[in-house]
Amino acid sequence: MHIAVVGLSHRTAPVEIRERLSIPEQTMETSLQSLRGHEQVLEASILSTCNRLEIYTLVRHPDLGVSAVSEFLSGHSGLATGELTPHLFNYHHEDAVDHLMRVAAGLDSLVLGEGQILSQVKKMMRLGQEHKSLGPILNRLLTQAVSTGKRVRSETNLGTGAVSISSAAVELAQLKLGQSRGLDQLVTLESEQIAVVGAGRMSRLLLQHLQAKGASGVVLLNRTVQRAELLAADFPDLPVQCRPLTDLDQCLSTCSLVFTSTAADDPIIDAARLEPLNRRSKLRLIDIGVPRNIAADAAAVDGVESHDVDDLQEVVARNQEARQAMAREAEQLLQQEAQQFLEWWDSLEAVPTINRLRSSMETIRVEELQKALSRMGPDFSARERKVVEALSKGIINKILHTPVTSLRAPQGRQERQQALRTVERLFSLGDD
């Protein structure tokens, strides 16, 4: 058995490719079932975010398993394998474990050290458990990854400061506004008329950062106004006007800055929608949805400046050096967590031998116990029989404790295999 991950991210694929591979939660069960239906895939889990799509698997054969996942991604996206492959990465075993630890810690994120990715890894594990696509190996790996992410944020400086895709989007708006005034710096958003489209987790983070950066008010649009109102209620100090999505055209006519973050499968803003507005002032659109909420042709409309998640690199580069120094603090911790999982994985090699050893000892125990009890005669009470049986079990457990602990202990693969062969020879443990 082998652990493998196949995926793509902001590092390997542009947003127009990533959006075609995005797997929303409502189709996650079907996708996991499809993967598990392949004879090569024993366990599977999917991480799908705006910046990455990664599929973690336990497979029978690494190359055949990776091919199975690649074929699934090709079918899901509608992209030919030859078109998709240049954007994919794959890692096996130790490299796959190391990669997941880095992802959970935020070290592989566009915004280095971002906190939201840990919640997304937790969600990946929860969905895998709910849809029964996880087994003991990936369940243990994901549990270790979540532990790693928590430790990095609590034990290193990388956990300081709120960083996320949403915070970078707000900073991008500040930067572009400053540049329009001839300034290479972030400026306040106090005078901007701002709209946020969508009322999910990303929109919540947008409202938090807009409030922190001086926004004087926000129009919050959503298909369901009630959901927008529930979100707005959590921001009593920020004037939020909740409106239905049918008011989007009006907001595009009056607002100067619009953020989009919806789960729509297709763009909700495009050139055809913007051109009739005949705006006289600049409209800045910032889209952090994947799939994209704003069509690529929107940027061609006069007076419109459109950005997507790939444009956040400009903001990220401004403070990346400082966060890189913080990230180095986390490297040793990541190595410890990865090694802990790999030692557990290696110890599984001893399980069949340990089980055969226990079975052999249990057979001997039962046979000898029956001989002893038959000699005791009918006067031997049921209580006394239980005491003797407990005694026999205790003796066996004491005898087995040291060899079993030794077989499970961290050690090199060659040393473990030699120890297994020694135990099997000494106790005559055959595969039968």
UniProtKB/Swiss-Prot annotation:
Write down the InterPro entries for this protein, in alphabetical order: 4pyrrol_synth_GluRdtase (IPR000343), 4pyrrol_synth_GluRdtase_dimer (IPR015896), 4pyrrol_synth_GluRdtase_N (IPR015895), GluRdtase_CS (IPR018214), GluRdtase_dimer_dom_sf (IPR036453), GluRdtase_N_sf (IPR036343), NAD(P)-bd_dom_sf (IPR036291), Shikm_DH/Glu-tRNA_Rdtase (IPR006151)
Which Pfam families does its entry note?
GlutR_dimer (PF00745), GlutR_N (PF05201), Shikimate_DH (PF01488)
Question: What's the domain remark here?
Answer: Possesses an unusual extended V-shaped dimeric structure with each monomer consisting of three distinct domains arranged along a curved 'spinal' alpha-helix. The N-terminal catalytic domain specifically recognizes the glutamate moiety of the substrate. The second domain is the NADPH-binding domain, and the third C-terminal domain is responsible for dimerization.
Recite the UniProt keywords alphabetically: Chlorophyll biosynthesis, NADP, Oxidoreductase, Porphyrin biosynthesis
NCBIfam families from the xrefs?
hemA, PRK00045.1-3
Tell me the active site.
Answer: C50
PROSITE patterns on file: GLUTR
> Which SUPFAM superfamilies does the record match to this protein?
Glutamyl tRNA-reductase catalytic, N-terminal domain (SSF69742), Glutamyl tRNA-reductase dimerization domain (SSF69075), NAD(P)-binding Rossmann-fold domains (SSF51735)
Q: What does this protein do?
A: Catalyzes the NADPH-dependent reduction of glutamyl-tRNA(Glu) to glutamate 1-semialdehyde (GSA).
Q: What is its EC number?
A: 1.2.1.70
> Which gene is transcribed and translated to give this protein?
hemA
What more does the record tell us? During catalysis, the active site Cys acts as a nucleophile attacking the alpha-carbonyl group of tRNA-bound glutamate with the formation of a thioester intermediate between enzyme and glutamate, and the concomitant release of tRNA(Glu). The thioester intermediate is finally reduced by direct hydride transfer from NADPH, to form the product GSA.
Protein name in UniProt: Glutamyl-tRNA reductase
Q: Which family does it belong to?
A: Belongs to the glutamyl-tRNA reductase family.
Q: Where does substrate bind?
A: T49, C50, N51, R52, S109, E114, G115, Q116, Q120
Q: Where does NADP(+) bind?
A: G198, A199, G200, R201, M202, S203
Species lineage, top-down?
Answer: Bacteria, Bacillati, Cyanobacteriota, Cyanophyceae, Synechococcales
Which organism was this protein described from? Parasynechococcus marenigrum (strain WH8102)
Site annotation (Important for activity) points to H99
Named from the GO MF annotations, one term is:
NADP binding
Q: In which pathway does it act?
A: Porphyrin-containing compound metabolism; protoporphyrin-IX biosynthesis; 5-aminolevulinate from L-glutamyl-tRNA(Glu): step 1/2; Porphyrin-containing compound metabolism; chlorophyll biosynthesis
- Note the superkingdom of the native organism: Bacteria
Describe its assembly.
Homodimer.
Report which reactions are catalysed by this protein: (S)-4-amino-5-oxopentanoate + tRNA(Glu) + NADP(+) = L-glutamyl-tRNA(Glu) + NADPH + H(+)
